[in-house]
Amino acid sequence: MQLKFLGKDSKPGESPTLYATDRASYVVQGWIVTDPDILATITLADHETLVEVPAKLMIHLAKDDLSGEVTNLAPPIVHVTAEGNYIVRGVRITDAEALGQMDIPDHETCVEVSKPAVAALLIGG
């Protein structure tokens, strides 16, 4: 899987990042979700996981000709935190080629979500 960097929301010690892939999907890199209340409410398949990212990370979708405001909070966004961050559910990235293109700190992981699913979240693009 080849990745195209779209953008990140960087603060010291934090690096949520958004990538487009060569297979009509996005890779969302974010914080590992550890909140037991959130984990208790979301059912995951064995190949899925969750990441938490700032909502403003999604502005970088415009760099892949997908713009608009996220107004439809539906999968792959499965929860919004009290801080306004998105909890994103997707396929856990295990592809060695993709992982080799990213710098992922120990407190983060990444998921793949389909482009059509992300496009369905937007209005006004």
Predicted regions: what they are:
Residues S25-P76, A96-A120:
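Acidic, aromatic-enriched beta-alpha/helix-loop junctions
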Residues G7-K8, Q29-G30, R89-G90:
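Pocket-edge structural micro-motifs
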Residues M1-D22, Y26:
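Short, charged/polar N-terminal "headpieces" of proteins
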Residues V70-T94:
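Charged/polar low-complexity intrinsically disordered segments, enriched in acidic residues
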Residues K11, A20-D22, V78-G84, P105:
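Short, ordered beta-strand-loop transition motifs
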